[in-house]
Amino acid sequence: MLLQRRFEERCAEAYALGKIGGFCHLYIGQEAVSTGSISLLRPDDYIITTYRDHGQALARGMSPRVVMAELFGRIDGCARGKGGSMHMFDKSLNFLGGHGIVGAHVPLATGVGFAIKYRGGDQVCVCFMGESVVNTGAFHEALNMAGLWKLPVVYIIENNRYGMGTALERASAIHDIFERGSSYNIPREQCDGQDVFAVRSAVREAIDRARTESLPTLLEVRTYRFMGHSMSDAVSGTYRSKAELDEYMKRDPIMLLRMQMQEQGELSEDDLHKLDEELKATVQDAWDFAEQSPEPPLEALYEDVLVDTTSDQIAEPVAAD
């Protein structure tokens, strides 16, 4: 969690300095969601997420160097500098990408779940999304299929209360949006997204259900972003007040975890300081690596446009039983 926080803080700095271009959506305030869920996954499980993807990428184990290089648009990034902030990807980790179109990745997650079931595996696909996704048509079609075919997908709604600048209450007739799962006859639950242990408990149950019973789950995780929607958005003062932000920051997930660990005697101030300094050094190393990485050559624009159909990585069809 602390690595994600320190990484995102430096991303904000890099964006202000013009080292990161294009869109950039920070994960500050929501770190308990990625940490509490991804820490439960096996290496062969799958993850697919939205454009706010840096936190999940780091939680899954992507190298901070590679993530930062991608943000800087450099050739050593995970997409060779072509994807940028919204399109982290690592096939070796079954991290199937951040996706820039709201809701477009939800059918892909459902397709991954179908592939798992078709091949007789016991893996799980975890699909992260923001609360605005629930008002897209693709969301409904994908969850209906998952409920109908009983697919091993855990759909995690990171409800941070605002879709860009629109409050949930102004956009959704149902405010407890996990209840939408009842329309597709799938298990559903709501949990506190600022408490990493609450997230972990809820996601563990959903993963067990997917792995042992091949059943999907719709999980609404109530969280809050401490930054604007993107780097072009004001932190407060437009659609939300500073007083509201200050109130939510009293439940900073990292602060809550630190307090719990200190109360239980598991973490001292010296331990925390040492860890923090180590993580800051890790992020600085990622920054230095990204700056030293070359920019992609112009001809790289024409590479990776089409899949190489001669590759032995193309999966052979699997006969159904």
Model-derived segments and spans:
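Short alpha-helical scaffolding segments that buttress acidic/His motifs in well-ordered protein cores
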Residues: 1-2, 68
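Cofactor-/ligand-binding subdomain signature composed of acidic, glycine-rich
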Residues: 2-21, 43, 256, 263, ...
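A short structural micro-motif
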Residues: 4, 43, 57, 278-285, ...
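Cofactor-binding active-site loop characterized by glycine-rich and histidine/acidic residues
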Residues: 9-13, 17-149, 167-173, 178, ...
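Conserved phosphate/pyrophosphate-binding and hydrolysis machinery centered on Walker-type P-loop NTPases
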Residues: 27, 276, 295
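Glycine-rich ThDP/TPP pyrophosphate-binding loop and its adjacent helix/strand module
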Residues: 95-292
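C-terminal intrinsically disordered, low-complexity extensions immediately downstream
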Residues: 288, 292-321
